[in-house]
Regions:
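Extended, non-globular alpha-helical segments
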Residues: 19, 23-27, 32-39, 221-245, ...
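Charged active-site motifs of nucleotide-sugar-dependent glycosyltransferases
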Residues: 44-46, 176-182, 215-216
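Conserved catalytic-core segment of nucleotide-activated headgroup transferases in glycan assembly
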Residues: 55-66, 73, 188-219
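Secretory-pathway glycan-assembly enzymes, especially type II membrane glycosyltransferases
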Residues: 69-155
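Structural motif
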Residues: 107, 180, 260-262
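Donor-binding and catalytic core of enzymes assembling or modifying cell-surface/extracellular glycoconjugates
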Residues: 201-289
Length: 318
Protein backbone atom coordinates (compact mmCIF):
# COMPACT_ATOMS: atom_id res chain seq x y z
CA UNK A 1 0.00 0.00 0.00
CA UNK A 2 1.50 3.36 -1.07
CA UNK A 3 0.67 6.78 0.33
CA UNK A 4 -1.98 7.38 -2.35
CA UNK A 5 -3.76 4.18 -1.33
CA UNK A 6 -3.46 5.20 2.31
CA UNK A 7 -5.18 8.50 1.57
CA UNK A 8 -7.95 6.70 -0.31
CA UNK A 9 -8.42 4.30 2.59
CA UNK A 10 -8.62 7.20 5.05
CA UNK A 11 -11.21 8.97 2.89
CA UNK A 12 -13.26 5.80 2.62
CA UNK A 13 -13.15 5.28 6.37
CA UNK A 14 -14.77 8.69 6.72
CA UNK A 15 -17.78 7.10 5.09
CA UNK A 16 -18.43 5.40 8.41
CA UNK A 17 -19.88 8.74 9.45
CA UNK A 18 -22.31 8.56 6.52
CA UNK A 19 -23.13 4.97 7.42
CA UNK A 20 -24.04 5.73 11.03
CA UNK A 21 -27.72 6.01 10.24
CA UNK A 22 -27.61 2.47 8.86
CA UNK A 23 -25.98 0.99 11.97
CA UNK A 24 -27.27 -2.40 13.14
CA UNK A 25 -24.61 -2.95 15.82
CA UNK A 26 -21.32 -1.45 16.97
CA UNK A 27 -19.41 -2.03 13.71
CA UNK A 28 -21.85 -3.12 10.99
CA UNK A 29 -24.12 -1.12 8.71
CA UNK A 30 -26.95 -2.36 6.51
CA UNK A 31 -27.96 -0.32 3.48
CA UNK A 32 -31.32 -1.59 2.23
CA UNK A 33 -31.66 -0.78 -1.47
CA UNK A 34 -34.29 -3.41 -2.26
CA UNK A 35 -37.03 -3.02 0.32
CA UNK A 36 -39.03 -5.98 -0.99
CA UNK A 37 -36.43 -8.36 0.46
CA UNK A 38 -36.42 -8.85 4.21
CA UNK A 39 -33.45 -10.02 6.26
CA UNK A 40 -34.73 -13.56 6.74
CA UNK A 41 -35.46 -13.99 3.03
CA UNK A 42 -31.89 -13.62 1.81
CA UNK A 43 -30.72 -16.70 -0.08
CA UNK A 44 -27.89 -15.68 -2.39
CA UNK A 45 -25.02 -13.94 -0.60
CA UNK A 46 -21.90 -12.53 -2.23
CA UNK A 47 -18.83 -11.69 -0.15
CA UNK A 48 -17.30 -8.87 -2.16
CA UNK A 49 -13.58 -8.10 -1.67
CA UNK A 50 -11.84 -7.78 -5.08
CA UNK A 51 -10.03 -4.50 -4.40
CA UNK A 52 -6.43 -5.20 -3.37
CA UNK A 53 -5.94 -1.61 -2.20
CA UNK A 54 -8.27 -2.28 0.71
CA UNK A 55 -8.17 -6.07 0.96
CA UNK A 56 -4.81 -7.57 1.85
CA UNK A 57 -3.97 -11.27 1.81
CA UNK A 58 -4.55 -11.79 5.52
CA UNK A 59 -7.88 -9.94 5.52
CA UNK A 60 -9.40 -12.78 3.50
CA UNK A 61 -8.71 -15.20 6.33
CA UNK A 62 -10.89 -13.14 8.66
CA UNK A 63 -13.95 -13.66 6.45
CA UNK A 64 -13.50 -17.31 5.46
CA UNK A 65 -15.20 -18.62 8.64
CA UNK A 66 -18.22 -16.46 7.78
CA UNK A 67 -18.38 -18.00 4.30
CA UNK A 68 -18.13 -21.47 5.85
CA UNK A 69 -20.88 -20.72 8.35
CA UNK A 70 -23.24 -19.27 5.74
CA UNK A 71 -22.66 -22.25 3.45
CA UNK A 72 -23.28 -24.76 6.26
CA UNK A 73 -26.43 -22.87 7.27
CA UNK A 74 -27.92 -23.27 3.80
CA UNK A 75 -27.22 -19.97 2.06
CA UNK A 76 -25.93 -19.90 -1.51
CA UNK A 77 -22.53 -18.28 -1.07
CA UNK A 78 -20.08 -16.89 -3.59
CA UNK A 79 -16.91 -14.94 -2.96
CA UNK A 80 -15.10 -12.27 -4.97
CA UNK A 81 -11.60 -12.02 -3.43
CA UNK A 82 -8.52 -10.43 -4.93
CA UNK A 83 -7.19 -12.57 -7.80
CA UNK A 84 -4.16 -13.82 -5.88
CA UNK A 85 -6.37 -15.26 -3.11
CA UNK A 86 -8.87 -17.06 -5.33
CA UNK A 87 -6.85 -20.28 -4.89
CA UNK A 88 -7.56 -20.25 -1.15
CA UNK A 89 -11.32 -20.24 -1.53
CA UNK A 90 -11.34 -22.64 -4.48
CA UNK A 91 -9.19 -25.06 -2.47
CA UNK A 92 -11.75 -24.92 0.33
CA UNK A 93 -14.70 -25.60 -1.95
CA UNK A 94 -16.17 -22.15 -2.51
CA UNK A 95 -17.55 -20.71 -5.73
CA UNK A 96 -15.79 -17.61 -7.02
CA UNK A 97 -18.20 -14.83 -7.92
CA UNK A 98 -18.27 -13.04 -11.26
CA UNK A 99 -19.57 -9.60 -12.18
CA UNK A 100 -23.04 -10.94 -12.99
CA UNK A 101 -23.27 -12.38 -9.47
CA UNK A 102 -23.32 -8.84 -8.09
CA UNK A 103 -26.70 -8.20 -9.67
CA UNK A 104 -27.94 -11.71 -8.91
CA UNK A 105 -27.13 -11.62 -5.19
CA UNK A 106 -29.78 -10.88 -2.56
CA UNK A 107 -27.12 -9.49 -0.23
CA UNK A 108 -23.57 -8.19 -0.59
CA UNK A 109 -21.19 -8.35 2.37
CA UNK A 110 -18.09 -6.17 2.24
CA UNK A 111 -15.84 -3.83 4.21
CA UNK A 112 -16.62 -0.20 4.99
CA UNK A 113 -13.49 0.82 3.08
CA UNK A 114 -15.22 -0.25 -0.15
CA UNK A 115 -18.25 1.97 0.40
CA UNK A 116 -17.68 4.26 -2.60
CA UNK A 117 -17.23 1.30 -4.93
CA UNK A 118 -20.05 -0.88 -3.67
CA UNK A 119 -22.74 1.73 -3.07
CA UNK A 120 -22.92 2.25 -6.85
CA UNK A 121 -24.33 -1.26 -7.26
CA UNK A 122 -27.53 -0.22 -5.47
CA UNK A 123 -27.81 -3.57 -3.74
CA UNK A 124 -28.69 -4.65 -0.24
CA UNK A 125 -25.28 -4.37 1.38
CA UNK A 126 -23.89 -5.20 4.79
CA UNK A 127 -20.78 -3.10 5.46
CA UNK A 128 -18.39 -4.37 8.16
CA UNK A 129 -15.74 -2.35 9.96
CA UNK A 130 -13.13 -4.94 10.98
CA UNK A 131 -10.83 -2.35 12.54
CA UNK A 132 -13.32 -1.01 15.04
CA UNK A 133 -12.12 -0.81 18.63
CA UNK A 134 -15.72 -1.59 19.60
CA UNK A 135 -15.06 -5.24 18.76
CA UNK A 136 -14.73 -7.16 22.02
CA UNK A 137 -14.36 -10.73 20.78
CA UNK A 138 -11.99 -12.63 18.51
CA UNK A 139 -12.54 -11.03 15.12
CA UNK A 140 -13.57 -14.13 13.15
CA UNK A 141 -16.11 -15.16 15.77
CA UNK A 142 -17.36 -11.59 16.12
CA UNK A 143 -18.04 -11.37 12.39
CA UNK A 144 -19.89 -14.69 12.32
CA UNK A 145 -21.97 -14.00 15.43
CA UNK A 146 -23.08 -10.53 14.35
CA UNK A 147 -23.92 -11.55 10.78
CA UNK A 148 -25.83 -14.54 12.16
CA UNK A 149 -27.85 -12.23 14.40
CA UNK A 150 -28.60 -10.02 11.41
CA UNK A 151 -29.75 -12.99 9.33
CA UNK A 152 -31.77 -14.44 12.24
CA UNK A 153 -29.84 -17.71 12.35
CA UNK A 154 -28.04 -19.45 15.22
CA UNK A 155 -24.23 -19.46 15.41
CA UNK A 156 -23.80 -20.45 19.06
CA UNK A 157 -22.11 -23.78 18.32
CA UNK A 158 -19.98 -22.57 15.40
CA UNK A 159 -16.22 -22.31 15.95
CA UNK A 160 -14.85 -19.55 13.72
CA UNK A 161 -11.30 -20.44 12.74
CA UNK A 162 -10.03 -19.91 9.17
CA UNK A 163 -9.42 -23.01 7.09
CA UNK A 164 -6.01 -24.22 5.98
CA UNK A 165 -5.46 -25.39 2.41
CA UNK A 166 -5.45 -29.06 1.48
CA UNK A 167 -3.45 -31.32 -0.83
CA UNK A 168 -1.10 -28.62 -2.06
CA UNK A 169 2.62 -29.17 -2.53
CA UNK A 170 3.81 -26.58 -5.02
CA UNK A 171 7.38 -26.19 -6.20
CA UNK A 172 9.15 -25.59 -2.88
CA UNK A 173 11.44 -28.38 -1.66
CA UNK A 174 13.00 -28.24 1.81
CA UNK A 175 15.49 -30.64 3.33
CA UNK A 176 13.48 -32.87 5.72
CA UNK A 177 16.54 -33.33 7.94
CA UNK A 178 16.89 -29.60 8.68
CA UNK A 179 14.76 -27.50 11.03
CA UNK A 180 13.78 -24.09 9.69
CA UNK A 181 12.49 -20.70 10.72
CA UNK A 182 10.87 -18.29 8.27
CA UNK A 183 12.00 -14.66 8.26
CA UNK A 184 9.95 -11.90 6.63
CA UNK A 185 11.09 -8.32 7.24
CA UNK A 186 8.78 -6.57 4.80
CA UNK A 187 5.52 -4.77 5.33
CA UNK A 188 2.78 -3.25 3.21
CA UNK A 189 -0.04 -2.01 5.40
CA UNK A 190 1.27 0.13 8.25
CA UNK A 191 4.65 0.77 6.60
CA UNK A 192 4.51 4.41 7.72
CA UNK A 193 4.79 3.32 11.35
CA UNK A 194 8.01 1.36 10.77
CA UNK A 195 11.52 2.87 10.97
CA UNK A 196 15.04 1.64 10.20
CA UNK A 197 15.55 0.65 13.82
CA UNK A 198 12.59 -1.72 13.59
CA UNK A 199 13.98 -3.48 10.53
CA UNK A 200 17.37 -3.81 12.24
CA UNK A 201 15.84 -5.19 15.41
CA UNK A 202 13.89 -7.80 13.45
CA UNK A 203 17.01 -8.93 11.58
CA UNK A 204 19.18 -9.00 14.69
CA UNK A 205 16.59 -10.99 16.59
CA UNK A 206 16.27 -13.56 13.82
CA UNK A 207 20.04 -13.96 13.49
CA UNK A 208 20.46 -14.55 17.22
CA UNK A 209 17.43 -16.81 17.65
CA UNK A 210 18.34 -19.01 14.68
CA UNK A 211 21.92 -19.39 15.90
CA UNK A 212 21.14 -20.43 19.47
CA UNK A 213 18.41 -22.84 18.32
CA UNK A 214 20.36 -24.30 15.39
CA UNK A 215 17.71 -23.30 12.85
CA UNK A 216 18.16 -22.61 9.15
CA UNK A 217 16.62 -19.32 8.04
CA UNK A 218 14.25 -19.08 5.08
CA UNK A 219 13.92 -15.50 3.81
CA UNK A 220 10.38 -14.81 2.58
CA UNK A 221 9.31 -11.83 0.49
CA UNK A 222 8.18 -10.74 -2.95
CA UNK A 223 10.31 -10.17 -6.02
CA UNK A 224 9.78 -6.44 -5.57
CA UNK A 225 10.92 -6.68 -1.94
CA UNK A 226 14.15 -8.33 -3.04
CA UNK A 227 14.82 -5.81 -5.79
CA UNK A 228 14.35 -2.83 -3.46
CA UNK A 229 16.28 -4.31 -0.54
CA UNK A 230 20.04 -3.71 -0.91
CA UNK A 231 20.94 -5.19 2.48
CA UNK A 232 22.95 -8.38 2.87
CA UNK A 233 21.65 -10.98 5.32
CA UNK A 234 24.55 -13.22 6.27
CA UNK A 235 22.35 -15.40 8.48
CA UNK A 236 19.92 -16.41 5.71
CA UNK A 237 20.35 -19.98 4.50
CA UNK A 238 17.63 -20.13 1.86
CA UNK A 239 16.48 -17.02 -0.01
CA UNK A 240 12.99 -17.63 -1.40
CA UNK A 241 12.09 -13.99 -1.99
CA UNK A 242 10.17 -13.74 -5.24
CA UNK A 243 9.85 -17.52 -5.50
CA UNK A 244 6.83 -18.23 -3.31
CA UNK A 245 3.14 -17.81 -3.98
CA UNK A 246 0.62 -17.32 -1.21
CA UNK A 247 -0.22 -21.02 -1.52
CA UNK A 248 3.46 -21.89 -1.05
CA UNK A 249 3.44 -20.06 2.28
CA UNK A 250 0.65 -22.30 3.53
CA UNK A 251 2.64 -25.35 2.44
CA UNK A 252 5.85 -24.15 4.10
CA UNK A 253 4.04 -23.38 7.37
CA UNK A 254 2.45 -26.83 7.36
CA UNK A 255 5.77 -28.71 7.31
CA UNK A 256 6.77 -30.36 10.58
CA UNK A 257 10.38 -29.20 10.28
CA UNK A 258 9.40 -25.54 9.87
CA UNK A 259 9.26 -24.56 13.52
CA UNK A 260 8.83 -20.78 13.86
CA UNK A 261 8.22 -17.51 12.09
CA UNK A 262 9.79 -14.09 12.68
CA UNK A 263 8.08 -11.14 11.02
CA UNK A 264 5.94 -8.07 11.42
CA UNK A 265 2.27 -8.67 12.22
CA UNK A 266 1.31 -9.60 8.69
CA UNK A 267 -0.06 -12.36 6.44
CA UNK A 268 2.59 -14.99 7.15
CA UNK A 269 1.97 -14.60 10.89
CA UNK A 270 -1.70 -15.44 10.38
CA UNK A 271 -0.82 -18.53 8.36
CA UNK A 272 1.42 -19.80 11.16
CA UNK A 273 -1.44 -19.23 13.62
CA UNK A 274 -3.57 -21.68 11.62
CA UNK A 275 -0.98 -24.40 12.18
CA UNK A 276 -0.58 -23.54 15.88
CA UNK A 277 3.04 -22.54 15.29
CA UNK A 278 4.76 -19.72 17.08
CA UNK A 279 5.50 -16.35 15.52
CA UNK A 280 7.88 -13.83 17.03
CA UNK A 281 6.34 -10.52 16.06
CA UNK A 282 7.61 -6.99 15.83
CA UNK A 283 4.34 -5.17 16.40
CA UNK A 284 3.79 -2.22 14.07
CA UNK A 285 1.77 -0.46 16.73
CA UNK A 286 -1.38 1.62 16.37
CA UNK A 287 -2.09 5.26 17.11
CA UNK A 288 -4.48 4.74 20.02
CA UNK A 289 -4.43 2.51 23.08
CA UNK A 290 -7.84 1.11 22.14
CA UNK A 291 -6.60 0.13 18.69
CA UNK A 292 -3.45 -1.46 20.10
CA UNK A 293 -5.46 -3.47 22.60
CA UNK A 294 -7.88 -4.62 19.90
CA UNK A 295 -5.08 -5.95 17.70
CA UNK A 296 -3.29 -7.79 20.50
CA UNK A 297 -6.43 -9.19 22.13
CA UNK A 298 -8.71 -10.04 19.22
CA UNK A 299 -6.69 -9.96 15.99
CA UNK A 300 -3.39 -11.69 16.81
CA UNK A 301 -4.74 -14.35 16.48
CA UNK A 302 -8.21 -13.54 15.04
CA UNK A 303 -9.70 -16.75 16.39
CA UNK A 304 -9.88 -18.35 19.82
CA UNK A 305 -7.12 -20.96 20.08
CA UNK A 306 -8.09 -24.55 20.83
CA UNK A 307 -8.20 -25.34 24.59
CA UNK A 308 -4.84 -27.10 24.53
CA UNK A 309 -3.09 -24.16 22.84
CA UNK A 310 -1.88 -21.25 24.95
CA UNK A 311 -1.59 -17.80 23.38
CA UNK A 312 2.05 -17.50 24.44
CA UNK A 313 2.79 -20.67 22.45
CA UNK A 314 1.76 -19.10 19.16
CA UNK A 315 2.66 -15.42 19.48
CA UNK A 316 5.39 -13.48 21.26
CA UNK A 317 6.14 -9.79 20.73
CA UNK A 318 9.79 -8.84 20.42
Amino acid sequence: MNYFSLIKKTVNLLNVVNLKKYSINSNMYFVNRESCIKNNKFKKILLYFPNQEFMHFGDHLFFEPLAKFLKETGFIVKIMPIKTMEFYFINNGYDIGKDNDILDADLLITRVEMYNEVIKFKKNTLFIDIASSNIKHYLCQDIVNKVADFLLVDAKSFYAKPSKINNYHGKIELNPDIEYITFNNYIDSGFYRVRKKHYKHLSDYCKHFAKINNLSVIHIGTKKDKEKDKNYYDFVDLDLRGETSAADLFYIASLDNVKYNISFDAFIMHIFFLYNKKSFILFRGRYTKEARNFVKQYLNPPFKPEPEIKIENIVEYI
